[in-house]
A protein has these predicted regions:
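Conserved N-terminal segment of class I S-adenosyl-L-methionine
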Residues: 1-157, 167-172, 207, 237-240, ...
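Conserved S-adenosyl-L-methionine
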Residues: 11-18, 219-229
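Conserved beta-strand edge residues that scaffold enzyme active sites
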Residues: 122-123, 143, 191-192, 227-229
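Short catalytic micro-motifs in class I SAM-dependent methyltransferases
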Residues: 157-162, 187
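Extended hydrophobic-aromatic, low-complexity segments
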Residues: 166, 195-197, 232-234, 252
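A short glycine-rich, Lys/Arg-flanked "PGG" loop and its adjoining helix->strand segment in the class I
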Residues: 167-183
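Short, glycine-/aromatic-enriched active-site segment of Class I SAM-dependent methyltransferases
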Residues: 184-215
Length: 293
């Protein structure tokens, strides 16, 4: 079992949990500190998992839920505003990998009048976006067959934690889909505050390991935001990174090890418990029909 970041086979058990009735083991690389599931052990490493099983396990059916639509609708303006600060000119073409219902693409389209394309393996979610007139594909390979050219922005929001090889996937995006002066935007759960441990989360990222993965995929970080939007005003549940292609991707920086990961997670979760107890309505912003106690 090799680490997807540094390739080391030295690891220790980081945590044992259960998710949707499945026992999960998370390992930590002893060399670089990355926290991950074994691809050999995880059912979520199978691509068919997302086409046929993922939504059914998580929400009992395959169709978009009110929670999905609400969270995506609240998240999209934040991401559009963040990316807008780094565009030299309005983006003409935008690709969203893991586009779900297409709400983020719809927001980009309305803001910049951009041509938008989405990748979504879930049939019902892809159909939902297509009904709004968004051009959608099941996989990047299907899009590549259409020879779409290059995009000014490629986003992957809550995607790379699900990928068996995030570095290879990001590298493929850089080489085949992103323009030379284009931007990459990724968002992942923050291991130091978010629950993170889920059947479908093959990798759990810290701010450090997210940046290292981007570096090894040939990207240069522009900004890394720790935030809770749209679920919390007090807890930095998410990490959002904007990056651009490195000037010379063949010369990758050396990998720096992440230290004291377990301790930082314990401190972060302790803060989370206090925030939830003392300021429940700020710690968690309610979803439609949800009451915060």
């Amino acid at each position: 079992m090799k680490c997807q970041l540094c390739g080391s086979e030295s690891h220790n058990v980081f945590s044992k949990v259960e998710s949707f009735g499945f026992p999960l083991v998370y390992y930590q690389c002893e060399q670089c500190g990355l926290v991950y599931q074994s691809l050999e052990e995880s059912q979520a490493a199978d691509p068919e998992f997302y086409a046929a099983t993922y939504r059914k396990i998580y929400q009992d059916h395959e169709h978009p839920t009110a929670k999905d639509l609400y969270v995506q609708g609240k998240r999209a303006p934040y991401l559009v505003q963040l990316s807008n600060k780094y565009f030299a000119h309005p983006p003409e073409k935008i690709l969203d990998v893991g586009a779900s219902t297409g709400i983020l693409l719809e927001t980009f389209q309305k803001t910049f009048n951009s041509e938008v394309v989405g990748i979504e393996p879930g049939d019902a979610y892809r159909a939902y976006a297509e009904r709004k007139g968004i051009r959608m594909f099941p996989t990047l390979e299907d899009l590549m067959n259409e020879q779409p050219g290059h995009f000014d922005l490629v986003s992957a929001i809550h995607v790379i934690e699900h990928l068996p090889d995030p570095i290879a996937s990001l590298r493929m995006i850089r080489e085949n889909f992103l323009s030379g002066d284009g931007l990459l935007m990724v968002e992942v759960p923050n291991l130091y505050v978010h629950d993170c441990y889920e059947l479908a989360h093959l990798t759990c990222f810290t701010p450090h390991t997210l940046v290292e993965v981007l570096n090894q995929a040939g990207f240069q970080l522009l900004t890394l935001r720790r935030h809770g939007s749209p679920r919390s005003r007090l807890m930095n549940l998410y990490l959002t990174a904007l990056a651009k292609p490195q000037s010379d991707p063949s010369r990758l920086p050396s990998i720096r090890s992440d230290r004291f990961v377990l301790l930082k997670r314990q401190v972060g979760l302790l803060y989370r418990r206090f925030a939830q107890k003392l300021f429940p309505h700020k710690a968690w912003l309610p979803l439609p029909g949800e009451k915060i106690r």
